């Protein structure tokens, strides 16, 4: 099937299948959805316009935030003031990143090596998360996760979900310095640090055309010490804000979207998201991350090595 705006011929079934893969990985691992979307657009389907690829990547990564945000809010799994600070920084960063990328990285010959370097970095980060050192550092965080998950299960079984607010995110102090409790544990953070992080992450993610979860999640878990149970919801809300800003800015600068092409991919992403929600609990997350780290490392090399005359 010919997609005139994208300027490529592609089998709709292939688009759907790739979308399923992207949706599954993004939902089950929580990272690399935008990177995989970009690989599909550039290497599998042959899109040649870098400024078309970037917003199309980000649109595919919006499925999970759009679906997940209301659910996370209902379960009190979003640190709203944190998400707002990240989102405000993200708006500024997304405008800067997309504007610079639209002019400086408009050609594939400059965009792909940049994309590859960041992909290599992401692969190394995911590989690190598979090590015993990283898993041991997350034991205290896991305790809060397990406490909250057990309580949610108990409240659901007894029909008392209205009591969830007692153990969910509850703020004691909001401002530059913030304090909140979650699952009986207290957490503190600086709002300015969060804003600056949101800005920097959005500059990078908007310039690449990805969501930014690969940086936000490690920041909140490793630097801020937040439990993963609230990190997921907080990150998807901020990604929703920054990615939407980036997409709109690319469009305002003249980037085009092949909506027919995207429709097939989005259908696949939706299917992959649902499948991951149902079956990912039966698949060893560490093995999945190890596989993804290897795939991303290869992809990164594929885009970087041509700089020194090597093609793989």
Give, region by region, the residue ranges found by the protein language model:
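Juxtamembrane transmembrane-helix boundary motif
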Residues: 1-23, 42-43, 50, 71-201, ...
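Short helix-coil transition sites and intra-membrane helix breaks within transmembrane domains
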Residues: 25-35, 205-213
């Amino acid at each position: 099937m010919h997609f005139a705006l994208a300027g490529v011929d592609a089998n709709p079934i292939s688009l759907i299948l790739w979308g399923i893969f992207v949706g599954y990985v993004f939902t089950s691992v929580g990272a690399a959805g935008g990177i995989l979307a970009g690989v599909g657009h550039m290497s599998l389907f042959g899109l040649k316009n870098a400024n078309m690829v970037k917003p199309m990547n980000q649109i595919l990564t919006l499925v999970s935030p759009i679906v997940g945000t209301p659910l996370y809010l209902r379960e009190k799994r979003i640190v709203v003031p944190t998400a707002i600070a990240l989102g405000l920084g993200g708006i500024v960063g997304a405008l800067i990143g997309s504007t610079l990328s639209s002019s400086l990285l408009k050609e594939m010959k400059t965009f792909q090596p940049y994309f590859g370097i960041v992909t290599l970095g992401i692969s190394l980060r995911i590989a690190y998360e598979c090590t015993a050192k990283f898993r041991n550092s997350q034991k205290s965080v896991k305790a809060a996760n397990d406490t909250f998950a057990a309580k949610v299960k108990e409240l659901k079984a007894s029909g008392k979900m209205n009591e969830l607010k007692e153990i969910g995110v509850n703020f004691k102090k909001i401002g530059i310095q913030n304090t909140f409790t979650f699952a009986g544990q207290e957490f503190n953070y600086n709002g300015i640090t969060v804003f600056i992080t949101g800005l920097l992450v959005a500059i990078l993610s908007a310039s690449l055309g990805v969501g930014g979860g690969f940086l936000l999640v490690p920041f909140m878990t490793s630097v801020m010490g937040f439990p993963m149970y609230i990190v997921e919801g907080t990150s998807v809300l901020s990604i929703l804000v920054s990615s939407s800003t980036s997409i709109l800015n690319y469009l305002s600068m003249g980037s085009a979207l092949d909506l027919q092409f995207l429709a097939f991919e989005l259908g696949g992403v939706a299917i992959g998201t649902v499948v991951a929600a149902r079956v990912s609990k039966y698949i060893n997350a560490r093995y999945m991350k190890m596989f993804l780290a290897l795939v991303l490392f290869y992809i990164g090399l594929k885009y970087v090595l041509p700089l020194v005359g090597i093609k793989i």
